[in-house]
Each structure stands twice: as structure tokens, then as C-alpha cells.
A protein has these predicted regions:
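Short catalytic/ligand-binding loop motif for oxyanion handling, primarily in non-cytosolic enzymes
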Residues: 95-97, 140-142, 180-181, 329-331, ...
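Intrinsically disordered, low-complexity Ser/Thr- and acidic-rich flexible linkers and loops
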Residues: 52, 235-256
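A surface-exposed, glycine/aromatic-enriched loop/edge motif typical of exported proteins
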Residues: 229, 234, 327-351, 410-422
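Outer-membrane beta-barrel translocator/channel fold
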Residues: 176-190, 214, 219-235, 252, ...
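Beta-barrel outer-membrane channel/assembly domains of diderm bacteria
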Residues: 2-3, 8-134, 158-168, 172, ...
Length: 513
């Protein structure tokens, strides 16, 4: 029977007209990381204001010791230099033994695999204009710290890059970070998915000269009234904490109804550059300004940031010094925030200034202990990177000093001592250790920190690296009654937190192909 069927099938194939096709080349790349780490003091709290001891690492529900695994796999389907498609998966980070992180017995967690990127890459026919469409990484440049203080995200959007010549280029993008996430919770604010989109538009103009790079950029955003809302709290969903004031007070007659019922406007602009004409000396800088105007002064935020780096490359390493300054809150919760607003920070972004205080680890180790950005701080630092006296072994050493730029009076609102008469206060935290971006700390002008870090890398094979990181941050928080200390309110005394320093050591095995 099979032979009888095969004869007509072969005959049919013979009469099908030939179709021209081009082979698609599939390219795979990826990174495997297995890591062991041990540390303490992640929140800088030994005992909280209620006398409760903080156990474990102090953040993210982690123990002092954790073991983790993360895999990233990217598959590129390349038809030609002008056309390709890419899918980029991330599995983990899985915490060994933790069920909701996919690491418990059976390793059958269902929430640890995600699509990080999925985009189409193509050249407009007859030109060198490259267009990328879909889920992709879009980021703003920073040649000094190597990590944007404003926007670096995996996001859905379209980016277009135009190389005018060897000196001038242009990248334009539109991205939609949020849309259709609002659900009417019975308060009658608005129907589901109404006025809840966030759209951003950006321009980056890289200028490359002999020994000099200059890149001005600008980004404009429109934020729907319900994009970040939960109930009567404009920022209550948690999505907008990066552009929200740390603590704000709305007039009582504004609470319980729409504060704006319109689109808010966000704007950022910056200039970054570096000079390498006097090799081996390099000078790099970055300056950013940003603002968000919701239509209600109390909800607004605007600020700026600037940094400078000088380094000198030698045979045995590259020593450098650097500094930064970022504006801080003025102590008045009725006029919004004076810190630089931002949108997102990517876990592929690695700061050259800090390996522990901000986004700085090369692996999946603990970092961003002080915050994902440097908003509301100033500081100076020194480092030696690529320090090497032995083949395949290199080190990076850092020392940083931090001081807050926020008014000390803000601490009294945040910790619950002060209220704003005739107003209702809102916040996404209630103490110094959970008021900065994504759980970082909030430093006032009377608070200081010092960071000491060592990172060592040994190349076991061409594609396998052993990475060891050891970091320590000492915190000097003003525990007087006028800042973060204990206080009396309504006949009750609330004591100060008992503090400790933060430290962490991790060992990572990184396979990259």
C-alpha cells in the first residue's frame, strides 16, 4: 500500500514548479552563569524601628547564602546582511531550592522563562538605514559611567539608525513601555485600559571625530493619567516609582478623584562625550536633565545629573578618578521632587563607577544596594581596572565616597514624623532603605557611605571565566531626631533603626559563546 501511495506523490512533486529560495543561516549565542554568594546587611538594618531583627541578606527574601543559575540564549535567523530576525530567551535567575524561582526539587517552575528580545532587523532597500522592530534593548548613552541614569530597557518599539557618513549618525526610536494595564477597581475612575499608555520618543546624534566623540540626545514621553494609578494614588501601581516623588502630599480635596485626567509630559536631554586624542589619557563626561509634569505640582519631578571621568592606560592596568553630582529634594513635599526622574535600568547595563552600590556586577550577584541610579547623591571615586600581572588573570579595584543631596527635612516626612496639614501623604516606602529606586536607600545631605570593591576574573578556557567579587559598603546615617532618628508622635515614641554595614562575596562561573 505504501508503495502505491509513493508513486503518485513522486509524480506530483515532479510537476510542481521550482521556487527560488535562499538559505537562512541560524546563529546561536548565549551565556550560562552559575553563582554562589554570601553576604549580609542588604538593607543596612540590623533591627527595625519596632525592634524586629532582620534575618538573611535583608532584601528580596534572600538568605545570607544563595546559589543561582541564569541562562540567556539568542537565536538569529539571518537571511542576509540586510535582513534578520532574533529571539532572545532568559531562563532564571533560578535560586537553588526556591520553588517560585524554579529551583526547587524537580526544577519545574513555570515563571522563570521569559522572552527578553524578539525583533526584526532590516535595511530599507537601497540604503544603509537599519530598522529594528519588536522587543529590543533601547538605551541612552553615557561614556563616563557606562550606564544610563535615565533609560536602558528591554521594551517594545521601533528604532531606526541612519549613518550619514563616518562622522555623523542618527538614531530615532519610539517605544511603548506601558499600555492596557489599568483595570477599574470599582472606584469609578475610568473604564478598563483607558488613558493608561506610556509612549516615549527619542533622538540620539552620535558625532565621531578623530580622538573625540560627542553624542547629544533627547527623549520625550507622554504618560496617561491611569498608567501608574491604583485607586486614588496616581503612582500606586508601582510602575512609576522612577518618576515619582519619594513622598508627596495631595490636597485633601484632590484625593478620591482624578488629579489630572490627562496626559503627563516627560522630557529628558543630555550630552555625553569622551576625548582620546591624547592617548593613553582619556577624559569622559555626561550631563543629563529630566522632568515629568503630570499637571499637578505635587506629583511632578525634575532634576539633573553630571559626571566626569579621567583615566590613564598603562601596561599593567588603567587607573582612573571620577566624580558625579545629582540634584536632590528640597524638603517641601508640596512642590514635587527635585531628583532626576528616570524610566528603567537594564540588567545588561553595568556601571563603571560602582560594582555594588549601583548596577555594577558582571554576573547575577547582588548589586544596586544604594540604588539603580545615582539620583539624589554626589560622590567621588577612584579605580584601577584591567589590573593584571599574570596571563588570563585581571582585577578591578574601586573605592567610592557618597553623600546625599536631599534635604534632611524630607527624612521626617518619610519616616512618618511630619504630616502636611490639609493634605494626604503618599509614598512607596516608609524609611531610608526603601525610598530610592527599586529598594535602594535615600541619602540626605547629612548621610554618607563609602564603598570598597574588588573584582577578579580568571579565564579558565576561551569561553569559560571564573569571576570573584568582594564588596563592602559602610553607611553613616544621621540618627539624630531631626533626620532619621527616633521621634515622638501622638503620644507614642518610635525608636531609630539599628544599623549595620552591607557586604557580599560571590563566585561565578560564566560560559559565553
Amino acid at each position: 500500500m505504501k508503495k502505491h501511495l509513493a508513486i503518485p506523490l513522486l509524480a506530483a512533486l515532479c510537476v510542481v514548479p521550482a521556487v527560488e529560495s535562499r538559505a537562512v543561516e541560524f546563529k546561536a549565542r548565549g551565556v550560562w552563569i552559575n553563582m554562589l554568594e554570601y553576604g549580609d546587611g542588604g538593607s543596612f538594618i540590623r533591627k527595625d524601628r519596632h525592634g524586629n531583627s532582620v534575618t538573611g541578606w535583608g532584601r528580596w527574601g534572600e538568605d545570607d547564602f544563595e546559589a543561582k543559575t541564569r541562562v540567556r540564549l539568542q537565536l538569529d535567523a539571518v537571511a542576509s546582511e540586510a535582513l534578520s530576525g532574533s529571539i532572545y530567551f532568559e531562563i532564571g535567575a533560578s535560586t537553588w531550592g526556591r520553588a517560585n524561582r524554579g529551583g526547587a526539587l524537580g526544577a519545574d517552575g513555570t515563571n522563570i522563562t521569559k522572552v527578553k528580545h524578539a525583533y526584526l532587523d532590516w535595511l530599507i532597500p537601497g540604503t544603509d538605514i537599519r530598522t529594528r522592530m519588536g522587543l529590543q534593548r533601547i538605551f541612552l548613552p553615557d561614556y563616563a559611567s557606562e550606564a544610563s541614569q535615565v533609560f536602558d530597557a528591554d521594551v517594545a518599539g521601533i528604532s531606526v539608525s541612519v549613518p550619514f557618513n563616518e562622522t555623523v549618525g542618527l538614531t530615532a526610536f519610539w517605544a511603548r513601555p506601558f499600555n492596557d494595564n489599568w483595570t477599574d477597581d470599582g472606584t469609578g475612575y475610568a473604564p478598563d485600559n483607558y488613558l493608561d499608555n506610556v509612549d516615549i520618543f527619542g533622538l540620539v546624534l552620535p558625532l565621531t571625530f578623530d580622538g573625540l566623540r560627542l553624542t547629544p540626545w533627547a527623549m520625550l514621553g507622554m504618560v496617561g493619567d491611569n498608567a501608574f494609578r491604583a485607586g486614588n494614588d496616581y503612582y500606586g501601581s508601582g510602575y512609576g516609582t522612577d518618576i515619582s516623588p519619594a513622598w508627596y502630599a495631595l490636597r485633601n480635596d484632590k484625593v478620591g478623584r482624578h488629579a489630572t485626567y490627562a496626559y503627563g509630559t516627560a522630557f529628558w536631554a543630555g550630552l555625553t562625550g569622551d576625548i582620546t586624542a591624547v592617548d593613553p589619557f582619556r577624559l569622559a563626561w555626561s550631563a543629563n536633565y529630566g522632568s515629568f509634569d503630570s499637571g499637578v505640582q505635587e506629583l511632578n519631578r525634575s532634576g539633573w545629573y553630571a559626571s566626569l571621568l579621567a583615566e590613564y592606560k598603562l601596561d599593567w592596568g588603567t587607573p582612573g578618578i571620577y566624580g558625579w553630582y545629582s540634584s536632590g529634594d528640597d524638603g517641601n513635599p508640596r512642590n514635587g521632587s527635585e531628583r532626576l526622574p528616570s524610566f528603567d535600568y537594564n540588567n545588561e547595563s553595568t556601571s563603571g563607577f560602582s560594582g555594588f552600590g549601583t548596577l555594577g556586577t558582571w554576573s547575577i550577584g547582588r548589586d544596586a544596594v544604594l540604588g539603580y541610579t545615582l539620583a539624589g547623591t554626589w560622590g567621588i571615586g577612584a579605580r584601577i581596572r584591567d589590573l593584571s600581572f599574570m596571563d588570563k588573570l585581571s582585577h578591578t579595584i574601586r573605592v567610592n565616597f557618597y553623600n546625599g543631596t536631599n534635604a534632611p527635612r524630607m527624612a521626617r516626612y518619610i519616616k512618618g514624623e511630619l504630616d502636611a496639614p490639609g493634605r494626604t501623604g503618599f509614598s512607596y516606602g516608609n524609611d531610608f532603605y526603601n525610598l530610592n529606586t527599586n529598594g535602594g536607600i535615600y541619602l540626605t545631605q547629612k548621610d554618607y557611605a563609602a564603598e570598597f570593591g574588588l573584582m577578579s576574573s580568571y579565564q579558565l578556557y576561551d569561553n569559560l571565566r571564573l569571576l570573584v567579587e568582594a564588596n563592602y559598603i559602610a553607611l553613616w546615617l544621621d540618627q539624630s531626631s531631626t533626620v532619621w532618628g527616633g521621634f515622638h508622635k501622638n503620644g507614642t515614641y518610635t525608636p531609630a533603626n539599628s544599623l549595620e554595614d552591607a557586604w557580599n562575596v560571590n563566585v561565578s562561573f560564566i560560559y559565553k559563546f
